[in-house]
Amino acid sequence: MSPSPVNTSTEPASVAAVSNGNATASSTQVPENNQSDSFAPPSNNSQQNQQSSTIAPNGGAGSVANANPADQSDGVTPSFVGSLKLDYEPNPFEHSFGSTASVGQGNPSLNRNPSLSNIPSGVPPAFARTLLPPVSSIASPDILSGAPGIASPLGYPAWSAFTRGTMHNPLSPAIYDATLRPDYLNNPSDASAAARFSSGTGFTPGVNEPFRSLLTPTGAGFPAPSPGTANLLGFHTFDSQFPDQYRFTPRDGKPPVVNGTNGDQSDYFGANAAVHGLCLLSQVPDQQQKLQQPISSENDQAASTTANNLLKQTQQQTFPDSIRPSFTQNTNPQAVTGTMNPQASRTQQQPMYFMGSQQFNGMPSVYGDTVNPADPSLTLRQTTDFSGQNAENGSTNLPQKTSNSDMPTANSMPVKLENGTDYSTSQEPSSNANNQSSPTSSINGKASSESANGTSYSKGSSRRNSKNETDEEKRKSFLERNRQAALKCRQRKKQWLSNLQAKVEFYGNENEILSAQVSALREEIVSLKTLLIAHKDCPVAKSNSAAVATSVIGSGDLAQRINLGY
């Protein structure tokens, strides 16, 4: 293996080599302006723990090569000198693929890091970093969280999102906003950790390293997930906008535990939850079904906590009856037109605005509207007896919804229907109780579609009478409408005539006034002309009139006519 290029430095430093998992500090102090360190990068994973010592040009392993500064001064350039501080930065990938036991536990050199203990004070604290753990530790939820001597997880605040209790996947989007939170460190009171964060991380490019900005991403370079994505996947921030009652509750019914050393990091998904994003995605259809179905089962109380909280929150809000939400959507058409089963009504819990319609004849209101107890149509519907007809036919269908003015009574007149039959009242029992006719429009636009109260259909002379009466009513209504239209027309005509007469009077008076003004002005003009003619030979009048004519109008034929008086 050929030695790496030799670098020069203006500051004294010491280099430590780690070999076979044991910390062997073979540092050699060199005079100022005469130090040169050379590192041989590890070739592969098998040679990391066997050969990590420095190789000098003379072939001595574990020693620092002392070269002549005169031999190195020719190859030193300003750009090469700017990257000298990379020599003091430890290689974070030397022990990345080591065993878990050798990281932080079996290898005490990683805790105290002797290679960084003797770095002079001139080196920035950003390079005093611990090494990365193996990949197997990165995939675990709590990586090096309890390791002694480590204030911040991994020593890199930008990578601290891997150690969060809600993080179970190193590629999870929750790392995006990890550095934006004030609790990204397990121990924010540690001054060294705060100093390391303020001075940059080992993966953050420095002032003289602009070429590394595109090669080394950090957690702060990614945007934070949107609120909808964060709520769906469970990546809640600690300053969540939702109340505590909407947080995730584990299956055992226990409240969320407090995780972390500060006591302010609440674990929304439990300490033992694995791959919480997929778990929440699998629970979204279940929660939607719980909201749509009646909440009557109390066997799994912990699982339905979120649904109950949402239902209570909605019921506390006040909505108008037209926009009131319904959590129990009933898709059965017979539930609206059929009778309510007492047992089904006990098991199915409906909102309060449905309960008002169940106390009247056992019928819920159509389309979920609120039923008014003082409604006369409801009283008439409740007093109508349908038990005899239902007993004869064996059917449980209720009559269609009608208004108070549309219900046939004993004193009502026969109404013409579309199929040629008419409604006539009689005391005879109905021969065909199931005979139904399509609803037609009467004066109010509605008619009953079912025979009730012992009414029956009759044909013959009554139909002719009803037809004649219907035509007479139509004729009367037509004449009445014509009379009303003629009356309105006459009223509009009178109004137009009155307005026209008022305009005529106004313009006549104005014309008289203007005529009087014209006459007065003419008289004044005549008097002025008379005065001018009487004083046309006066020298003062001539001079004054000439001066006025010259200054105001100007010299010309008009001025001469003014002077002459005409």
UniProtKB/Swiss-Prot annotation:
Keyword terms, alphabetized: Activator, DNA-binding, Meiosis, Nucleus, Phosphoprotein, Transcription, Transcription regulation
GO cellular component, as recorded: atf1-pcr1 complex; chromatin; heterochromatin; nucleus
Spans traversing the lipid bilayer: none
Q: Where is the composition biased (Basic and acidic residues)?
A: 466-479
Q: Could you name the domain of life of the organism this protein comes from?
A: Eukaryota
Protein's GO biological process: activation of reciprocal meiotic recombination; negative regulation of adenylate cyclase-activating glucose-activated G protein-coupled receptor signaling pathway; negative regulation of antisense RNA transcription; negative regulation of reciprocal meiotic recombination; negative regulation of transcription by RNA polymerase II; positive regulation of transcription by RNA polymerase II; reciprocal meiotic recombination; regulation of transcription by RNA polymerase II
Q: How is it modified after translation?
A: Phosphorylated by sty1/spc1.
What is the native source organism of this protein? Schizosaccharomyces pombe (strain 972 / ATCC 24843)
- Which Gene3D superfamilies does the record match to this protein? 1.20.5.170
Q: Gene deleted: what happens?
A: Sensitive to methyl methanesulfonate (MMS, causes DNA breaks), hydroxyurea (HU, ribonucleotide reductase inhibitor), thiabendazole (TBZ), sirolimus (TORC1 inhibitor), and cold. Simultaneous disruption of dph3 exacerbates sensitivity to HU and MMS.
InterPro entries on file? bZIP, bZIP_sf, bZIP_transcription_factors, TF_Aft1_HRA, TF_Aft1_OSM
Bias type Low complexity, positions: 43-53, 107-117
Instruction: Just give the chief location class.
Output: nucleus
Q: How does it assemble?
A: Heterodimer of pcr1/mts2 and atf1/mts1.
Which intervals of the chain are annotated as region Basic motif?
A: 474-503
**Protein family according to the UniProt entry:** Belongs to the bZIP family.
Subcellular location, in the record's words? Nucleus
Residues in bZIP domain copies: 472-535
Show the segment(s) annotated as Disordered.
Answer: 1-83, 96-117, 315-345, 357-479
- Function of the protein: Transcription factor required for sexual development and entry into stationary phase. Binds and activates CRE sites (cAMP-response elements, also known as M26 meiotic recombination hotspots).
> Which segments show compositional bias classed as Polar residues?
1-42, 65-76, 97-106, 379-412, 421-460
Q: What is this protein called?
A: Transcription factor atf1
